[in-house]
């Protein structure tokens, strides 16, 4: 496994393998089993791993990821786990887009959907497309969920104000 560690200033680099993408006529760098860790000044940590990362030379700050697992460790809070089939990670600002079969779990809660935009610097996540929240006693079906991972403050709503969030009791 290869590791990247980023503490907003320092980067430990790993060996990379370059391949030519002949169909796009551009050069990309591919990294297997990538692990990237970022820590902010408050002591919060964001770790993202993927089976495969592609970095295109023309925009090297973006990594296109496959089989993604991420953890958000907020100081003195529960750990949040995020998994998805694909992701796009920005190594400059740590913003990440998770897509296809996105699952977010933390103790007693699970959110699933097809698209999640996550900002580590602001600890905000926005879920869209087929969003389902499952709690210990309630399931919610909505178009959009916005969540602050530090405070766990959550907004759940529909895009069309004429529609309502569907709420089901589970017990």
Segments from the language model and where they lie:
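Mature-chain termini and adjacent capping regions
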Residues: 1-171
């Amino acid at each position: 496994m290869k590791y990247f560690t980023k503490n907003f200033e320092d980067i430990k680099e790993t060996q990379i393998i370059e391949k030519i993408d002949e169909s796009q006529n551009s050069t990309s760098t591919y990294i297997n089993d990538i692990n990237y860790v970022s820590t902010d000044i408050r002591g919060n940590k964001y770790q993202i791993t993927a089976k495969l990362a592609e970095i295109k030379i023309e925009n090297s700050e973006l990594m296109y990821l496959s089989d993604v697992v991420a953890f958000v460790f907020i100081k003195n809070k529960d750990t949040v786990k995020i998994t998805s089939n694909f992701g796009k990670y920005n190594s400059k600002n740590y913003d990440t887009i998770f897509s296809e079969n996105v699952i977010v779990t933390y103790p007693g809660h699970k959110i699933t959907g097809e698209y999640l935009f996550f900002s580590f610097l602001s600890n905000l996540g926005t879920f869209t497309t087929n969003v389902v929240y499952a709690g210990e006693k309630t399931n919610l079906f909505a178009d959009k969920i916005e969540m602050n991972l530090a405070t766990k403050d959550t907004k759940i709503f529909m895009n069309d104000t004429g529609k309502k969030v569907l709420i089901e009791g589970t017990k």
